Amino acid sequence: LDRNTAELLVQRFRQGSTLICGGNSSGKTTLLNALKETLPDDMAILVAQQADELTTLFHPDMMFLHSLPGTSESSVNYDLKHISIAGLTMDVDFFIIGEVKGGEALYLLNAAYTGQICAATVHAPSADRAPEKIVDYAMYDSRYSRNELMKMMDCFQTLVFMEHYQVKEIFACLGWNAEKENLELSLIHISEPTRH
C-alpha cells in the first residue's frame, strides 16, 4: 500500500466497523493484527478468536477470549458464538472476531448495528461478496430475514479484500439502497496488477 492509502485505511478502521476478507492464507489476519495495533491506548478492545493468531505487544487494554471446544472429558464448550454473546455485555470500545465461521456472525452484526465499532475477517472471493458471507453465517441463528440482515450490513463502513498478502480492494459502504435492495458500495482503492 502507498502511504496515503495506508493512512486512509487506518483512519477508517479507527472510526467505523471493518470487514477484511480473502481466501486462505491471503493476509487477512496479518492485516487485522497490524490495524488493531494502531488503536489508541485509551480504547478498550475485546478480541474473540479460535486460534492464537491475533496478539498484541503494545496495547495496554486489549483483552483476548479464546474458544474452548467441548471434549469427552468435559461438557464445557465455549465457541466463538458464546464468546461473542458474552462480548456484547462487556464495556469495550472495539470488538474484534479473529475469523467469522458460524453463528457468531449474528452477534458481530448486532454489535456493529448498535453502534459498537467492530472488525472481523471472513473467507470471501471479493470485498463486495463479504457481506453476503456474513449474512449466510448470521442466518444460522437468526430469525431476521436475509434482506433484513443485508440491511444491517451497512454498519460495516469499510470492506477490504486481501490476496497474496496485498490489499487488493477497499470499498466504502454508503448504505442500503431500498429500491435496489442491496448495499451501495464505493471502490476507494484497487491495487495495480503486479508485473512479472
What are these regions (language model features)?
Residues I188-H196:
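Conserved small/polar residues in nucleotide/adenosyl-binding loops
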Residues S17-N24, A34-M152, H164:
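Switch/coupling sub-region of P-loop NTPases
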Residues L1-Q15:
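P-loop NTP-binding catalytic core
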Residues E148-A178:
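Phosphate-binding/switch region of NTP-binding enzymes
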Residues L31:
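Hydrophobic positions on the alpha1 helix immediately C-terminal to the Walker A/P-loop
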Residues G27-K28:
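Conserved glycine(s) of the Walker
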